[in-house]
């Protein structure tokens, strides 16, 4: 919202409205002063951070350069030599980058901090002094006026005349102070627009130039980077193949260390514990044993020397070896041997199961005879015996322990569970088990039921329907979820559906007593989800779906009455579930990945041919001079097809657009930029419709009206090279550092310049008469010229006239 102007005529009246308007200006001045302080503070912090960052990078480069690779072996490959020297190359590159950055940082304070501080102290500070004088003179005038009005008319005429003259003098002084203050505060209000923006513009200009020089160094770094990447990949491939061989060797060593023994060494050796029987009991002694398979000779070296007795190695000839039954001894990893030298059996204990297996393989040991395992596949089928077992378990649970707290969650004894299952599924008399025997408690029955269901050859809800059930549980639509599961239940085989109904009905009864047993449908789903459903493959993805298996069982329990009332009607089609995540139609635009658009190229004023050696074109397209400050970066309009032709699909600009040099350039993302960095080919320099390409000697000042924020150019332009990044500096050549400008560039002239067949130097071409004397003058010229333009010229492009 704009402020009303302060009229000089109001200074004489000094009305309340005038004071109120003046107060608005004072508040705005104070806000501007605070803003400048913040900019100075944050700018100083930024410059300090850049200086600290540069110092940190240089310290980092020193650390890289101080390290020297060591290696295994007596020589290095060419790739390893490249890798060993890489840190030195990195350090040199970082030093070069930071040297250029430090040159920019050294001038940053002069560009940003000092001009702002000068404006704040001199202009705003002077305005505050005017304010103090204005307030002081006003207070003195009104105080004198009050005293003057209280004078009696009976005073002498000379005294009254003298008082009138004094009041007029103070009024005149106050009026002058008011005029000076109003003039000064309005001047600061207008001049702050360029006095604040210009230093920031100059600082950003120097900052971006420094960044663009970093891009040049990146271009020089690319060939080395590619070669180093190739060396790294080759070295990695060598390492991978070597590691595979070493892993195989390590694996063989872990599984069977004797296979890696050297000639002349025993077949197997290691620590074993020997059971020694004495009159007062049994003890275990530690021995280091060696066994030779060819001679069947076992050498035992005692490790625990008894006091007063000297023990030496004992050689025994092996006759027989067998693994000790687990239930026959309270020790683990035991096996028995018989020897010719000692009568009876010698019991040995290995450190681990794997080590015992190695000893038994070396000694040709045998396994003890066991009963048939109870978990054979043919006994864990969903057959008549299985149904009988499930019904007996359910009957016992609902009769004896349905109110037991933690039912199905508390696990029973594994030995008792195995004993019950072995007795019930005994092929000789299957099902002949009395559950009401005191040997079976409620935890044993529930654990046996879960064990049977989990060890079926195929889960109750089958592998075939597993994915469909999980997919239904993943739906956000509750109606679809219930309808789909309802339909899938009736796709189960008849015996599976019968078993599922039997179990779910039982779980419903259990959940009805949840106040006593604390087993809710959710808790039962957690227990019976993995029991009734199981993925055919054991993968991480399958494990992640267990929570959806639990949801399926929970739905079956909560909607048992509806699901098992009957199959769903054929006409009833479950509603289509909505997608869990809406598909994205447009990819988000980010800094590194943008839509391809016409790129804006920046140029400055044209330069004379005889000054080419002192000019440099920066990576953002700006031609700068080492002697003179650069002019304002100016945008170019989109490229014209031909001189005198317009693009039929292009809309007319909302403001006049001056004719300019142009070339088709597209904005690229980071990946495309790297591709262009690696591309060594050059493209033909496009010809403009109104003159030579900038950088070839003569350029033309132009402007481009921006209706939206212009994309920042990513391409890097050098002298005469419009494709960018195709011109590589020689390895030995050092890039000349471009000093930041000493003052910000002048604003462009937005007037329409008629197209001419020959380019004519304008502002910035060396003719000092055409350069505006100040920023204010240039802007005045712009507004005066723009005010004469009519709306009819806005519908044409400059190229349409020719």
Swiss-Prot record:
<dbReference type="GO" id="GO:0099149">
    <property type="term" value="P:regulation of postsynaptic neurotransmitter receptor internalization"/>
</dbReference>
<dbReference type="InterPro" id="IPR004148">
    <property type="entry name" value="BAR_dom"/>
</dbReference>
<dbReference type="GO" id="GO:0034329">
    <property type="term" value="P:cell junction assembly"/>
</dbReference>
<dbReference type="GO" id="GO:0030100">
    <property type="term" value="P:regulation of endocytosis"/>
</dbReference>
<dbReference type="GO" id="GO:0098880">
    <property type="term" value="P:maintenance of postsynaptic specialization structure"/>
</dbReference>
<dbReference type="InterPro" id="IPR008936">
    <property type="entry name" value="Rho_GTPase_activation_prot"/>
</dbReference>
<feature type="region of interest" description="Disordered">
    <location>
        <begin position="606"/>
        <end position="665"/>
    </location>
</feature>
<feature type="region of interest" description="Disordered">
    <location>
        <begin position="681"/>
        <end position="802"/>
    </location>
</feature>
<dbReference type="GO" id="GO:0005737">
    <property type="term" value="C:cytoplasm"/>
</dbReference>
<dbReference type="GO" id="GO:0043195">
    <property type="term" value="C:terminal bouton"/>
</dbReference>
<dbReference type="GO" id="GO:0098978">
    <property type="term" value="C:glutamatergic synapse"/>
</dbReference>
<dbReference type="GO" id="GO:0043197">
    <property type="term" value="C:dendritic spine"/>
</dbReference>
<dbReference type="InterPro" id="IPR047225">
    <property type="entry name" value="PH_GRAF"/>
</dbReference>
<dbReference type="GO" id="GO:0021707">
    <property type="term" value="P:cerebellar granule cell differentiation"/>
</dbReference>
<dbReference type="InterPro" id="IPR027267">
    <property type="entry name" value="AH/BAR_dom_sf"/>
</dbReference>
<protein>
    <recommendedName>
        <fullName>Oligophrenin-1</fullName>
    </recommendedName>
</protein>
<feature type="domain" description="PH">
    <location>
        <begin position="265"/>
        <end position="368"/>
    </location>
</feature>
<dbReference type="GO" id="GO:0007165">
    <property type="term" value="P:signal transduction"/>
</dbReference>
<feature type="compositionally biased region" description="Basic and acidic residues">
    <location>
        <begin position="716"/>
        <end position="732"/>
    </location>
</feature>
<comment type="subunit">
    <text>Interacts with HOMER1. Interacts with AMPA receptor complexes. Interacts with SH3GL2 (endophilin-A1). Interacts (via C-terminus) with NR1D1.</text>
</comment>
<keyword id="KW-0254">Endocytosis</keyword>
<dbReference type="GO" id="GO:0003779">
    <property type="term" value="F:actin binding"/>
</dbReference>
<dbReference type="GO" id="GO:0048667">
    <property type="term" value="P:cell morphogenesis involved in neuron differentiation"/>
</dbReference>
<dbReference type="InterPro" id="IPR047234">
    <property type="entry name" value="GRAF_fam"/>
</dbReference>
<dbReference type="Pfam" id="PF00169">
    <property type="entry name" value="PH"/>
</dbReference>
<comment type="function">
    <text>Stimulates GTP hydrolysis of members of the Rho family. Its action on RHOA activity and signaling is implicated in growth and stabilization of dendritic spines, and therefore in synaptic function. Critical for the stabilization of AMPA receptors at postsynaptic sites. Critical for the regulation of synaptic vesicle endocytosis at presynaptic terminals. Required for the localization of NR1D1 to dendrites, can suppress its repressor activity and protect it from proteasomal degradation.</text>
</comment>
<dbReference type="GO" id="GO:0051966">
    <property type="term" value="P:regulation of synaptic transmission, glutamatergic"/>
</dbReference>
<dbReference type="GO" id="GO:0005096">
    <property type="term" value="F:GTPase activator activity"/>
</dbReference>
<dbReference type="GO" id="GO:0048488">
    <property type="term" value="P:synaptic vesicle endocytosis"/>
</dbReference>
<dbReference type="Pfam" id="PF00620">
    <property type="entry name" value="RhoGAP"/>
</dbReference>
<dbReference type="GO" id="GO:1901799">
    <property type="term" value="P:negative regulation of proteasomal protein catabolic process"/>
</dbReference>
<dbReference type="GO" id="GO:0030425">
    <property type="term" value="C:dendrite"/>
</dbReference>
<dbReference type="InterPro" id="IPR000198">
    <property type="entry name" value="RhoGAP_dom"/>
</dbReference>
<keyword id="KW-0524">Neurogenesis</keyword>
<dbReference type="GO" id="GO:0045198">
    <property type="term" value="P:establishment of epithelial cell apical/basal polarity"/>
</dbReference>
<keyword id="KW-0963">Cytoplasm</keyword>
<keyword id="KW-0343">GTPase activation</keyword>
<keyword id="KW-0770">Synapse</keyword>
<feature type="domain" description="Rho-GAP">
    <location>
        <begin position="380"/>
        <end position="564"/>
    </location>
</feature>
<dbReference type="GO" id="GO:1900242">
    <property type="term" value="P:regulation of synaptic vesicle endocytosis"/>
</dbReference>
<dbReference type="Pfam" id="PF16746">
    <property type="entry name" value="BAR_3"/>
</dbReference>
<dbReference type="InterPro" id="IPR011993">
    <property type="entry name" value="PH-like_dom_sf"/>
</dbReference>
């Amino acid at each position: 919202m704009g402020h009303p102007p302060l009229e000089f005529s109001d200074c004489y009246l000094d009305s309340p409205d005038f004071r109120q308007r003046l107060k608005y200006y004072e508040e705005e001045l104070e806000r501007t002063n605070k803003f400048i302080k913040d900019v100075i503070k944050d700018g100083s912090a930024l410059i300090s951070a850049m200086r600290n960052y540069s110092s940190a990078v240089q310290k980092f480069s020193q650390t890289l350069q101080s390290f020297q690779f060591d290696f295994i072996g007596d020589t290095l490959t060419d790739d390893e030599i490249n890798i060993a020297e890489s840190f030195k190359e990195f350090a040199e590159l970082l030093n070069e980058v930071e040297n250029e950055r430090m040159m920019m940082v050294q001038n940053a304070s002069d560009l940003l901090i000092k001009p702002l501080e000068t404006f704040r102290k001199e202009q705003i500070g002077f305005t505050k002094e005017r304010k103090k004088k204005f307030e002081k003179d006003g207070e003195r005038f009104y105080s004198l006026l009050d005293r003057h009005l209280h004078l009696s008319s009976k005073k002498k005429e000379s005294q009254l005349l003298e008082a009138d003259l004094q009041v007029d003098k103070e009024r005149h002084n106050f009026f002058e102070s008011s005029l000076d203050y109003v003039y000064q505060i309005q001047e600061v209000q207008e001049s702050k627009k360029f006095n604040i923006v210009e230093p920031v513009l100059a600082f950003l200009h120097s900052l971006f130039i420094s960044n663009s020089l970093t891009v040049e160094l990146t271009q020089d770094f690319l060939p080395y980077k590619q070669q180093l990447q190739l060396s790294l990949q080759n070295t990695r491939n060598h390492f991978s193949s070597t590691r595979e061989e070493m892993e195989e060797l390590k694996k063989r060593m872990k599984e069977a260390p004797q296979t890696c023994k050297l000639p002349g060494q025993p077949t197997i050796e290691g620590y074993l514990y020997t059971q020694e029987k004495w009159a007062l009991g049994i003890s275990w002694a530690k021995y280091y044993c060696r066994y030779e398979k060819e001679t069947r000779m076992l050498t035992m070296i005692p490790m625990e020397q008894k006091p007063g007795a000297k023990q030496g190695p004992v050689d025994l000839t092996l006759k027989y070896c067998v693994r000790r039954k687990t239930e026959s001894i309270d020790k683990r990893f035991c096996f028995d041997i018989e020897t010719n030298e000692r009568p009876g059996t010698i019991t040995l204990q290995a450190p681990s199961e794997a080590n015992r297996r190695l000893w038994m393989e070396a000694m040709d040991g045998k396994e003890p005879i066991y009963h048939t395992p109870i978990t054979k596949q043919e006994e864990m089928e969903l057959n008549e015996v299985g149904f009988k077992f499930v019904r007996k378990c359910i009957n016992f649970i609902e009769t004896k322990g349905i109110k037991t707290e933690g039912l199905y969650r508390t696990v029973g004894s594994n030995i008792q569970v195995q004993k019950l299952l072995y007795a019930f599924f005994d092929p000789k008399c299957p099902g002949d088990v009395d559950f009401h025997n005191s040997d079976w408690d409620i935890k044993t029955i529930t654990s046996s039921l879960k064990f049977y269901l989990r060890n079926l050859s195929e889960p109750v809800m089958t592998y075939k329907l597993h994915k469909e059930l999980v997919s239904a549980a993943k739906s956000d639509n509750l109606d679809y979820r219930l309808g789909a599961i309802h339909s899938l239940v009736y796709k189960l085989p008849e015996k599976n559906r019968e078993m599922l109904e039997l179990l779910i009905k039982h779980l419903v009864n259990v959940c009805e007593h949840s106040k006593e047993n604390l087993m809710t449908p959710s808790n039962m789903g957690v227990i019976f989800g993995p029991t009734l459903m199981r993925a055919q493959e054991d993968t991480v993805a399958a494990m992640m779906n267990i929570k959806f298996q639990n949801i399926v069982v929970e739905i079956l329990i909560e909607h048992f009455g509806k699901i098992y009332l009957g199959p769903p009607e054929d006409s009833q089609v479950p509603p289509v579930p909505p997608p869990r995540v809406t598909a994205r139609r447009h990819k988000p635009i980010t800094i590194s990945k943008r839509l391809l658009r016409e790129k804006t190229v920046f140029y400055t004023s044209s330069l004379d041919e005889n000054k080419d050696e002192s000019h440099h074109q920066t990576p953002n397209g700006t031609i700068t001079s080492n002697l003179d400050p650069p002019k304002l970066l100016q945008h170019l309009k989109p490229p014209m097809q031909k001189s005198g032709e317009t693009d039929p699909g292009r809309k007319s600009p909302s403001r006049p657009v001056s004719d300019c040099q142009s070339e088709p350039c597209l904005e690229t993302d980071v990946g495309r930029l790297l591709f262009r960095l690696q591309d060594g080919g050059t493209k033909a320099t496009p010809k403009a419709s109104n003159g030579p390409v900038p950088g070839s000697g003569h350029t033309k000042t132009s402007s481009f009206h921006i209706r939206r924020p212009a994309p920042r150019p990513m391409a890097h332009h050098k002298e005469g090279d419009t494709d960018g990044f195709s011109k590589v500096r020689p390895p030995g050549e050092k890039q000349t550092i471009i000093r930041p400008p000493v003052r910000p560039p002048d604003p462009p002239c937005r007037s329409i310049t008629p197209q001419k067949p020959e380019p004519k130097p304008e502002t910035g071409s060396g003719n000092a008469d055409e350069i505006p004397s100040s920023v204010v003058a240039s802007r005045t010229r712009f507004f005066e010229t723009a005010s004469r333009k009519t709306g009819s010229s806005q519908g044409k492009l400059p190229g349409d006239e020719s």
